[in-house]
């Protein structure tokens, strides 16, 4: 018997301690089932009400470093083809969960720490929608190195331009940029998920993900949204924690609109829209964050 709704996360073995803390944080505030997909590993996540599923997938070999270390935290190398081949499992995992475990799913990035509002994410789901509802991006236009930007009516320098050219998509219709770290999806979105993965798997993109998909599966999701002229989604519901702190966020407060406080850090419009703190990968630091959030209840 399927659940009405569930959370889904995924990881490889090296990343599993981070994802386990993410699942633990959700469980502090939610009794909704959690499914963790573990890529090419039998390791199990030890959190109550959480089921671990082995997910076998092909990982394209790439000898370049997968991660870069920054203090006690680390970040993925978006140039790395192995990382790309793991990230594009996201739509397939969401599809699998919808087909086998639940009528609706909420995908959550594994380097997230939930707040008491986490379950509100399911309130944004339209069960009749034929596409996932992705979270609003922190910025409307992204840059990477010397690439990116839209100048006047010239879209040819945008990060998404090569993929738009590849798939024949007119990006001038674009409105809000969407991020793929948080989304909700129902059964009627399975066709979208399949097309998303098919586009991500294009041989030219696999061979040169840096050119065509600089933000990996997220770049391609936006191209597909523009192709279908889909503009709705989740509001901005998280805070990047790397350059701020939980105490600072609550000290600044909520202004009724998305509030950019520094580069790559914004606070959602309302406190009830703050569902997750994002970006901390050190399990010890994540545990401290969980305890601080519990104390603030």
PLM regions with names:
Residues 1-5, 9, 18, 163-180, ...:
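A glycosyltransferase accessory/donor-loop signature
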Residues 1-78, 99-102, 255, 281-286, ...:
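N-terminal anchoring/stem segment of glycosyltransferases
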Residues 15-16, 84-87, 214:
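A conditional alpha-helix N-cap/helix-loop micro-motif detector
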Residues 20-27, 94-95, 119-123, 221-222:
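Short amphipathic alpha-helical segments and helix-helix/interface helices
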Residues 37-44, 116-118, 237-239:
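Short, polar loop motifs at secondary-structure junctions
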Residues 56-81, 142-170:
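Charged, glycine/proline-rich intrinsically disordered loops and linkers
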Residues 86-145:
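GT-A fold catalytic core of metal-dependent nucleotide-sugar glycosyltransferases
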């Amino acid at each position: 018997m399927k659940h009405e709704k569930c959370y889904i996360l995924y990881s490889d073995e090296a990343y599993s301690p981070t994802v386990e803390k993410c699942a633990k944080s959700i469980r502090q505030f939610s009794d909704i089932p959690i499914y963790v997909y573990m890529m090419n590993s039998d390791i199990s996540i030890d959190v109550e009400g959480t089921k671990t599923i082995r997910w076998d997938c092909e990982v394209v070999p790439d000898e370049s470093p997968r991660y870069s270390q920054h203090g006690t935290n680390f970040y993925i190398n978006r140039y790395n083809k192995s990382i790309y081949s793991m990230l594009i499992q996201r739509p397939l995992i969401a599809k699998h969960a919808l087909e086998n475990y639940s009528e609706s799913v909420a995908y959550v990035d594994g380097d997230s720490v939930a707040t008491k509002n986490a379950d509100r994410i399911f309130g944004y789901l339209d069960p009749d929608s034929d596409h996932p509802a992705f979270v609003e991006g922190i910025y409307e236009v992204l840059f990477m190195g010397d690439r990116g930007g839209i100048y006047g009516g010239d879209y040819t320098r945008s990060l998404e331009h090569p993929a738009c050219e590849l798939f024949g998509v007119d990006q001038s219709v674009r409105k809000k940029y969407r991020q793929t770290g948080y989304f909700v999806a129902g059964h009627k979105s399975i066709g979208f998920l399949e097309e998303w993965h098919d586009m991500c798997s294009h041989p030219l993109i696999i061979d040169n993900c840096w050119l065509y998909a600089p933000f990996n599966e997220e770049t391609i999701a936006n191209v597909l949204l523009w192709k279908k002229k889909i503009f709705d989604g989740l509001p901005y519901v998280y805070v990047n924690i790397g350059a701020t702190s939980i105490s600072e966020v609550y000290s600044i407060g909520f202004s009724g609109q998305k509030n950019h406080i520094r580069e790559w850090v914004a606070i959602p419009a309302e406190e009830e829209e703050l569902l997750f703190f994002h970006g901390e990968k050190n399990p010890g630091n994540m545990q401290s964050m969980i305890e601080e959030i519990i104390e603030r209840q």
